[in-house]
Amino acid sequence: MFMKTDDFDYKLPEELIASYPLENRDASRLLKLNKQTGEIADYKFTDFIDFINPGDLLVFNNSKVMLARLYGSKTTGAKLEYLIERIKTPKLFETHIKANRSPAIGSEIYVEDTLAKVLDKDGGMYLLEIQGDKDIYQLMEEFGHIPLPPYMKRDDEEFDAERYQTVYAQDLGSVAAPTAGLHFSKELMQQIKDKGVDIAYITLHVGSGTFKPVQVDDVESHKMHAEVISVPVEVCQKIRQTKENGGRVIAIGTTSVRSLETAGQNGQIEPYQGETDIFLYPGKKFNVVDAMITNFHLPKSTLIMLVSAFADKEKIIKAYEHAIAERYRFFSYGDAMFIF
């Protein structure tokens, strides 16, 4: 079945793009969508506690956002801007480089105050090796900026270092926050535990490809970027137990969805460590996830395709139209949906 990328477009008034977070994480709004009936209802995010039951399992992505934006220069003094994509060893890393003229392979360039050698280039991605004493972790710690999404159209500010990070972030490696998790305050996490709802953590390091628009007309011919994930054995055990006892597996964010569905591709959830380029679009089956919390996604993005695969495209577009009419806030610092 031929699916056009344009079918996943919608018109969003620019003022509904949330450039700043709310004062309190859990003060955002929550649109509840029943994927069977299409019924839509408006709530506060803190009401989520009433939609989950003892015996349910919430699966969070514990990846931590790197201070991945760095600056530097060529030895000539020409300015460079870096977006660190993936760290291979403390002194070897893949990065995007914004420059008037691309640095040549074999050349030496400065990352902040430290010299690095350009070992290789693949498309827009450079492989750099640090020549000085500092490693990339030290450089990020000393000079790094939170890499806010391009649509926020602003430089990062001090509060972003805390607010563009989930309260349970642990494993450093993402270029963008797993944003559905940003709504969970420490108090709400405690309430969830107190209610007897189980919690598990997977890791998916979000790559910058998450912001890449789909550039082909035919959805199925889009090639997904690869991201590193880890679905540990104890998470698989919890999922099997939850299913056996009649509970629901509720994924917090599309990164958790993609991780769990990668690990469950054969119909049975198995531990998984490695890369995933899973692409979930209408017609694809979900083997693990029963419900999800997710933010509102960019038009024509792979993520609006994912939620359309889960809940049916017409229902999603209708929910988005409702959210626009009700002035919900969109994208990373915006409001959320609970699709069940």
From Swiss-Prot:
GO terms for cellular component: cytoplasm. Gene3D superfamilies: QueA-like. InterPro entries: QueA, QueA_dom1, QueA_dom2, QueA_sf. Pathway: tRNA modification; tRNA-queuosine biosynthesis. Coiled coil: none annotated. GO terms for biological process: queuosine biosynthetic process; tRNA wobble guanine modification. SUPFAM superfamilies: QueA-like. It comes from the Bacteria. Its EC number is 2.4.99.17. Keywords: Cytoplasm, Queuosine biosynthesis, S-adenosyl-L-methionine, Transferase. It is an enzyme of class 2 (transferase). The keyword Transferase applies. It is found in: Cytoplasm. One of its GO terms (molecular function) is S-adenosylmethionine:tRNA ribosyltransferase-isomerase activity. It catalyses: 7-aminomethyl-7-carbaguanosine(34) in tRNA + S-adenosyl-L-methionine = epoxyqueuosine(34) in tRNA + adenine + L-methionine + 2 H(+). NCBIfam families: PRK00147.1, queA. Belongs to the QueA family. Monomer. Transfers and isomerizes the ribose moiety from AdoMet to the 7-aminomethyl group of 7-deazaguanine (preQ1-tRNA) to give epoxyqueuosine (oQ-tRNA). This is S-adenosylmethionine:tRNA ribosyltransferase-isomerase. It comes from Francisella tularensis subsp. tularensis (strain SCHU S4 / Schu 4).
